[in-house]
A protein has these predicted regions:
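Periplasmic/extracellular loop-to-transmembrane helix junction in inner-membrane transport proteins
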Residues: 14-23, 46-89
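Short cytoplasmic-facing helical segments at TM-TM junctions of multi-pass membrane proteins
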Residues: 114, 157-199, 225
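Transmembrane alpha-helical segments of polytopic membrane transport and secretion proteins
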Residues: 1-34, 256-275
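Transmembrane-helix boundary motif in ABC transporter permease subunits
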Residues: 86-116
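Generic hydrophobic transmembrane alpha-helix motif, especially the helices
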Residues: 117-153, 160-161
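Hydrophobic alpha-helical transmembrane segments of polytopic membrane proteins
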Residues: 224-262
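Hydrophobic alpha-helical elements at and bordering transmembrane segments
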Residues: 64, 73-77, 81, 111-118, ...
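Transmembrane alpha-helices
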Residues: 144, 148, 180-214, 238, ...
Length: 275
C-alpha cells in the first residue's frame, strides 16, 4: 500500500512542479505592472496632483472601456497600426538591405556610412516639416517619415551583424564549395540575424515615437497620437492614458507574437542565444 501511494505521489509531482513553475512565471511577468499600478494609485489618491490631471486607474479603465465600446478607440488604434506597419515595413526592407550591403561591400560602406552617420543623430521631428512640404498633409507623409526615421537603427545593426560574422565560418563555407548565394543564405544572414532582430526592435520603438508625434502635425483625422494630443487640449488625462495603454499593448503584442516567435524559431533554435 505504501509503495502504491509513493508511486502515485511520484506520478503527480511533475504536474505540481510544472504548475508551480507556470504560476511563478505568470507572477514574475505581472509583478512589475502590479508595482507600477500600486505606485500610480498612491500618487493619484494622495492629492499631489489634481484628480483631473492624474486620474486613478479606475478612471483610466472606465475611459478605456467606454472608448472601446463606442468604437472610437479601435478606430484610432487601427489607423495608427496601419501607418506603423506600413512605415516599419519600408524601414525593415530598406534598412536590412542597406545594412547588409554595407557589411558585404567595402565600397558601399565607404559611400553610405558617412550619410547614415550624419542622418541618424538628427531627431525624427526635425525631418517632419520637410516631409510635410514634400508629400503634403495626411497618411503618405506620415508613413514615409516613419519609414525613413526608423530605418537608421536597422541599418546600423544589420551592418554590425554582418561585420561580426566570424571569418572562420566564411572561410569554412568557402572551402566546402559554397557560392556567394549559399554563403549569404547559410552563413552571413543567420550569423547576423541576432543583430538584425535587435535593430528591428529598436526601429519599431523609433517608429512609435515619431508616428505618435507626427500624427498631430500631419493633420490626420484619426490615430492614437491625434487622440492623445486632442485629449490634452481638454485636460482629458484619462483619455490620454487610455491611448497610451493601447500603444503599450500593441507594442507588447508585437514583441510577444512577432519578434519572440521569430527569435525562438531561428536564433534560439540554432543555439546562438538562450531563450
Amino acid at each position: 500500500m505504501q509503495d502504491a501511494l509513493t508511486a502515485i505521489s511520484a506520478d503527480h509531482a511533475p504536474g505540481r512542479s510544472q504548475g508551480s513553475e507556470r504560476l511563478r512565471l505568470i507572477w514574475r511577468n505581472i509583478f512589475p505592472f502590479v508595482v507600477v499600478g500600486a505606485i500610480w494609485e498612491i500618487i493619484a489618491w494622495s492629492g499631489i496632483f489634481p484628480r483631473r490631471l492624474f486620474p486613478t486607474l479606475e478612471d483610466v479603465v472606465s475611459s478605456f472601456v467606454n472608448l472601446t465600446i463606442t468604437g472610437i478607440l479601435p478606430h484610432h488604434a487601427i489607423d495608427t497600426l496601419i501607418r506603423l506597419l506600413s512605415g516599419f515595413a519600408l524601414a525593415a526592407i530598406a534598412g536590412v538591405t542597406v545594412g547588409v550591403l554595407m557589411g558585404r561591400s567595402r565600397r558601399a560602406e565607404d559611400i553610405l556610412l558617412p550619410l547614415v552617420s550624419i542622418g541618424a543623430p538628427i531627431p525624427g521631428l526635425a525631418y517632419a516639416p520637410l516631409f510635410l512640404l514634400w508629400f503634403g498633409l495626411g497618411n503618405l507623409s506620415s508613413v514615409l517619415l516613419v519609414g525613413f526615421v526608423s530605418a537608421f537603427p536597422i541599418i546600423f545593426n544589420s551592418w554590425t551583424g554582418v561585420k561580426a560574422v566570424k571569418e572562420i565560418w566564411v572561410r569554412s563555407a568557402q572551402a566546402m564549395g559554397a557560392d556567394d548565394r549559399r554563403l549569404f543564405r547559410h552563413v552571413i544572414f543567420p550569423g547576423a540575424l541576432p543583430y538584425i532582430l535587435t535593430g528591428l526592435r529598436l526601429g519599431l520603438a523609433q517608429a512609435w515615437r515619431i508616428l505618435v508625434a507626427v500624427e498631430m502635425l500631419a493633420a490626420v483625422p484619426w490615430g492614437l497620437g491625434w487622440l492623445i494630443f486632442g485629449a490634452r487640449k481638454f485636460l482629458n488625462t484619462d483619455t490620454m492614458m487610455a491611448g497610451i495603454v493601447v500603444i503599450a499593448l500593441i507594442g507588447l503584442a508585437l514583441e510577444k507574437f512577432v519578434f519572440q516567435k521569430i527569435e525562438n524559431y531561428t536564433v534560439v533554435r540554432w543555439g546562438m542565444i538562450s531563450s
